[in-house]
Structures are given as structure tokens and as C-alpha cells.
Amino acid sequence: MARSTADQHWMDRAFALAENGRWNTAPNPRVGCVIVSGDQAIAEGWHAQWGGDHAEVDALKQLDASDPRLAEATAYVSLEPCNHHGRTPPCTELLIQRGIPRVVVGMQDPDPRVAGSGIERLRGAGIEVVVLNGQTSGRWLNRRFLSSLERGRPWVVLKCAVSPDGFADPPRKHQERGSLPITSAPLRKLTHQWRAEEQAILVGAGTVAMDDPRLDVREASGPAPIPVVMDPHGRTSPSAQVYQHPQAVVWGGHNALPAHVVQLDTSDGPAIESVLKHLHHTGCRSVLVEGGPYTLNGFFQSGLWDEARWCMGPTPTGGGMPAPALPEGAILRGAHPYGEDHVRYFVNPHSADWVGHAPSPTLALPLPA
């Protein structure tokens, strides 16, 4: 296998390993590492937990420091190794100490604390460093992290459940409260896994008033996102379940809300821009929008969205609130059947241009039997 072909092969493996940390690394980037000697992987690792071992450490701790294979090994790291003391020591120093002669990096880290210094440190120690910048797979892998650093806002994912006849909210009696599901249980479980991937989850006041959702991840593993409610007219109840979250945020609201709820001033610019600005300033890298048609249309009209996941259930509702229309130019990344349901993945063309491209999606959970 030619060296360039081998480099790409092992880097693709590092990218795949990095995805193992997608639920617990935020606000850090996702990083994978493969240590290769000859044509064999001798160790693999990934950054699994914010504040925990970085990918290089996770891989190298599987090998004895005196392992002779390290003297001819190549370390494939999906993102430039860090060169600063944070919650963990610099990964550059460990690579140097272990005597690895060659390091292949998926992309340079734009974080100002790194920004090429890791590559310089390794080269200064006599290590051959190959940088595969232009690897858009690496940019897509860390699109949340990069959006915060390069665009100054969280990555925005919109999710909508749609009936086959085009409705997003089935008819219900006025006094009924609680969600009336359009999709089946397996897809709702997948939605909870999507929630765990994002740092915040946003809904409108209507969703809270009608459904009183918990917006948690009870059917999946991973951290619960910070709930954000758009409530400019103070419609939501202080006893709503979302306000039990210790970091709950509301744009608007009223004075009767629990004291711990962060209330954003409605005079501080347009609603969506104001909320995204607040989330960015608090270190939030991504937000999942599960609001109703009015809220989703607001994001479409503002242009401040990146991905849209349209989940079509199996049964027509015969009426209700029409689902939002996807903007002209939205790029279909892929479509998957999921049990009785069907999921379509779209990306904002401007977001696709910024990332470089949008790879075909993979589902976060196994397909139901």
C-alpha cells in the first residue's frame, strides 16, 4: 500500500474512532488516534470524556513505554495534538517522550491555544509531521467545535416529526395535554440519542404550554442538554418540567419563574440571534431545535440553521398544523428507513460550503430489528 493511501486509510480510522466520544466530549472537539507499526494498528484510542484522557494518551497507555515498535511507528491523530497545559498535560510531550518518529495530523486545530504550535513542537523535536489539511471529513466531524471558533455561534440542528400527509402537529382537543406522537417508539429513542449529542435543546412556548415536555435523554445514554424556551409573551407555567433543569434558559418569560432560570432580555436584538449569542458566550457549541412549526420556520427564515432532520411517521393524521417547508436549496444528505418511520437529513447549503462538504449521515443507534 502506497504511503499516501495508507495515511488516508488510517486517518479514516482515526475519524471513526473519534465518533465514539460524541456524547461526552463537548465542549472539546472529538479526536481519535491510531498507532501503526509496519502495516498493523498496535493501539487505538479516542477522547471519551471532557476533562479525561486525550486520544493520544488513550492509545499510548495501551503500550509499554519501552515497546520497540514505537521506534518505527506512525501516530495518526484526527486533530493537531495539543501543546498547552489545560485539564491534561500536552499531548505533544507524550508523543516526543515515547519516541514516535512520525505523526500524521488530520487537520490543524484552530483553537488559539494550539493553532499550529503542536505541529511546530513536534517538528522541533525532530518528528516528521504530515498535515492532511483539507480533510473535510475532519471538519464535519468537529463542525460544532469549529462553528463556535470560526463563526461565533453554535451549530444548529432542526428536528421535525412529520406525518405522511404533511402535518407536524396532529389535531387534539383543546384540553388535552401531552405529546401526541407522530413517529414510532424506536425513532423517538433515536431522537433522545440526538439530544445527548447536543449541548442545548430549544423549543417554543407553545410546545411547553401544550406538551409540558421534559426534554431529557431518559431513553438514551449521555448528558441531558440545557433546555431553552422561546417565550416572549410569558405563556409558560413556572411549574413546567423544563424549568426543573438547573441551567434552564428562557427568552422572555415572566417574574414568577424559578430563580435559577436564566431569563434573556427580549430587547437585546432579534430572538434567535439573541439566544444563539447567549449560548455561544456560555460555551455552548450546539443546539437541537425541537420546536413546533412556528419556531422551526423562524430558524429557516433567519438562515441561522445548519442541519435539518425530517422524521416521517407511518400514519396520516388527517389534519393538524402543517409542517414547515424546507427552504429552497436545502441539500438532501441522505435518507434512511428506521423501522416504520423514515428519516431524511438536510444541510443548509451555506453550512455545507463552510464545512467543505456534508458526508452521508450515519445513524447514532442500530436500526431496529
Q: Would you name each region that the model predicts?
A:
Residues 2-29, 87, 155-369:
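Enzymes that bind and transform nitrogen-containing heteroaromatic metabolites
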Residues 12, 16-19, 43, 54-57, ...:
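A broad detector of short, well-ordered amphipathic alpha-helices
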Residues 35-137, 300:
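Zn2+-dependent cytidine deaminase-like catalytic core
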Residues 37-38, 150-151, 347-349:
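Active-site beta-strand termini and strand-to-loop segments that position acidic
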Residues 68-71, 98, 151, 196, ...:
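Structured loop/turn residues at beta-strand edges in well-structured enzyme cores
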Residues 142-153:
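Flexible, polar/acidic helix-loop-strand segments at domain edges
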